[in-house]
Regions:
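Compositionally biased terminal segments of proteins
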Residues: 1-181
Length: 181
């Protein structure tokens, strides 16, 4: 198996997720690192945002992550072996105002990774665009939608629920513009 130093973000996230699983700590990857995995190199995030699905104590997380070389530094866990760092944003796991119902799983040489589905990843990025006008997140949503199958009916329904039908139309136009380039 690869060393931590040799792992890309997906491999490291799977390694961490599998290690935590062995100790009864159930996490799911969210945020920009999911974009990195689904958008195949269009975007790189050094921050691995794991949502703790069971509300594990910080003390237990520290103990278990130390076993694989990660030390707590402020709100992050860092290792001398990698430029990637781990964070545990507070849950629950949600996109916009809705909880995530079903997670995706990917198998890597380094372990199994639970993460947002491509559709929920797009919704997560669109949430930042819809509510804060974050155009970088809009671009990330476009990249994922170009690279992975997306449930368009679900994204349209969710966008309506978020009160962002006009911005959904803008997202579709941006996707079309990017496809024509």
């Amino acid at each position: 198996m690869k060393t931590v130093r040799e792992m890309n973000s997906g491999e490291l996230a799977a390694f961490v997720c599998s290690h935590l699983d062995r100790y009864g700590i159930r996490v799911a990857l969210s945020g920009g690192a999911v974009v990195s995995i689904y958008a195949s190199g269009n975007y790189v995030s050094k921050d691995l945002d794991f949502i703790d699905l069971l509300q594990t104590t910080r003390q237990k997380l520290k103990k278990v992550l130390k076993q694989i070389g990660f030390e707590e530094k402020s709100r992050y866990f860092v290792s001398k072996e990698t430029e990637f760092f781990i964070e545990f944003p507070s849950g629950p796991l949600a996109v916009g105002n809705e909880p995530v119902e079903k997670l995706a799983e990917l198998q890597f040489e380094t372990g199994r990774l639970r993460l947002l589905s491509p559709t929920d990843c797009v919704k997560d990025r669109l949430s930042a665009f819809y509510h804060w006008g974050d155009r970088q997140c809009l671009q990330q949503a476009v990249w994922v939608a170009q690279m992975k199958p997306i449930d368009w009916v679900e994204i349209k329904r969710w966008s309506r629920q978020e009160g962002a039908e006009e911005k959904f139309v803008e997202f579709r136009a941006e996707l079309q513009d990017n496809s024509n380039r």
